[in-house]
Regions:
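Conserved beta-propeller blade signature
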Residues: 32-34, 72-75, 117-120, 128, ...
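Short loop/turn microsegments at loop-to-beta-strand junctions
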Residues: 39-40, 125-126, 157
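Extracytoplasmic beta-rich repeat domains
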Residues: 4-28, 53-69, 91-114, 140-156
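Hydrophilic extracytoplasmic domains
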Residues: 122, 133-174
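Hydrophobic packing within well-folded, soluble alpha/beta domains
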Residues: 32, 41-44, 49, 127
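Short loop/turn segments that connect beta-strands within beta-propeller blades
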Residues: 1-2, 45-48, 86-91, 131-135, ...
Length: 174
């Protein structure tokens, strides 16, 4: 327990523009999930650092989140869609797709699953929230014209948001 390195992982790309430089890993049951600009969703064994699977079906880029119960990993694609995958050690393929129509997207912020909804921001200053079980859009609110950082869902009806332009907003969502 001294902070010693256990393992390192990379996707094999020497180009930092394609490496997982801005991803925030999610984990469940000994598996780490990441999405890098190479547009693969990758599952890594948390004990060994070995790649378990890589999936490029939906071209997820850097933005992921995990369900409250850990059973589902969510990814934001570069065009309009949120995709979901079951968390497991073999490639599950896409569980579902939800077209939210947000357009071209590249903000590396997390999708936050809390209080039965998943909430995230986009490069155009719009915050979205969807029901991961339906799946369907619950609400969307434009707060600015710049990139939205990872949101802070405070309660089932209150979300705190900041943008790259320095705008801080508290949203009442119900």
């Amino acid at each position: 327990k001294d902070g010693a390195l256990i393992w390192k992982w990379n996707n094999g790309s020497p180009n930092r523009m394609l490496s997982p430089a801005m991803c925030t890993p999610a984990a469940h049951n000994g598996i780490v999930y990441i999405a890098a600009p190479d547009r693969y969703l990758t599952a890594i064994d948390a004990g060994t650092g070995a790649t378990l699977w890589r999936n490029k079906e939906a071209t997820v880029r850097e933005s992921t989140g995990i369900s409250e119960d850990g059973s589902t990993i969510f990814g934001k694609t570069m065009n309009d869609e949120i995709v979901a995958y079951k968390t497991q050690s073999t490639d599950p393929g896409i569980l579902w797709r939800l077209n939210l129509g947000f357009g071209y997207e590249h903000v590396p912020s997390m999708l936050i699953a809390k209080f039965g909804q998943v909430t995230f921001g986009t490069k155009n200053g719009v915050v979205y929230s969807f029901d991961p079980l339906a799946p369907k859009l619950l609400w969307a609110h434009k707060i600015d014209n710049s990139m939205v950082n990872t949101v802070n869902v405070l309660s089932d009806d209150t979300t705190l948001v900041a943008t790259m332009d320095g705008v801080v907003t508290l949203l009442k969502t119900r």
